[in-house]
């Protein structure tokens, strides 16, 4: 009946005491010569680019984001890549500041639910979109993300309060839940989706890091993230034949 798919202190210089001595002549020429022979350490040290606040945007839509009744899918928010063009990152880590999302949810009646001889019954259901932080991201042996059921226990929990199953709480935590209770009389219904989630504040900083093992793989996909990945879970529950399509734009503000 159910189906699931995936997708840097302060530096201090101590001054030495200067004692005046008579009868002693010093040759400063040698000292000046030594200064000239000293290597210019600053010029040989590679200065890293300054980290700046930037924003990266990602649109999640298409056939893979269409949910049939009683189904769910899991995906991730793509982080910036280590490139020269902005938005980018200049380190193997970034500070996650805030994520905003805005989009549309479209609920459609299934073809088999149409009644020819009378009015169609209402389609009722619950849609959930959950933003989750993965503290220690890594691809499992199956090569996929944890499913909705594996992370939250069962899709039916969307009717109440979602929580991460005890076995996975050390790795995952919920950052935001968007929930819409739907009652559809016509064939289609459009619902607005929007929200903002703070990832860092004055008391806590959320940093993400990357492996960046090879030049070609210095990107922001889940497989290259080693700390604090952002996952998104979508779920549509309904007893009637129907489908839910999502188009959601994510904007991630970060220091990188």
Curated annotation (Swiss-Prot):
Mode of membrane association: Peripheral membrane protein
N-terminal signal peptide: none
Transport found in the keyword field: yes
Region: Disordered, residue numbers: 1-46
Chief location category: host cell
Keyword Ribonucleoprotein: no
A GO-annotated cellular component: host cell nucleus
Lineage: superkingdom: Viruses
Residue ranges annotated as motif Nuclear export signal: 177-198
Keyword entries, A-Z: DNA-binding, Host cell membrane, Host cytoplasm, Host membrane, Host nucleus, Host-virus interaction, Membrane, Transport, Viral movement protein
Motif (Bipartite nuclear localization signal): 21-42
GO biological process entries: DNA transport; transport of virus in host, cell to cell
Subcellular location: Host nucleus; Host cytoplasm; Host cell membrane
Function: Binds to the genomic viral ssDNA, shuttles it into and out of the cell nucleus. Begomoviruses use 2 proteins to transport their DNA from cell to cell. The nuclear shuttle protein (NSP) shuttles it between nucleus and cytoplasm and the movement protein (MP) probably transports the DNA-NSP complex to the cell periphery and facilitates movement across the cell wall.
This protein's name: Nuclear shuttle protein
Protein species of origin: Squash leaf curl virus (SLCV)
Organism phylogeny: Viruses, Monodnaviria, Shotokuvirae, Cressdnaviricota, Repensiviricetes
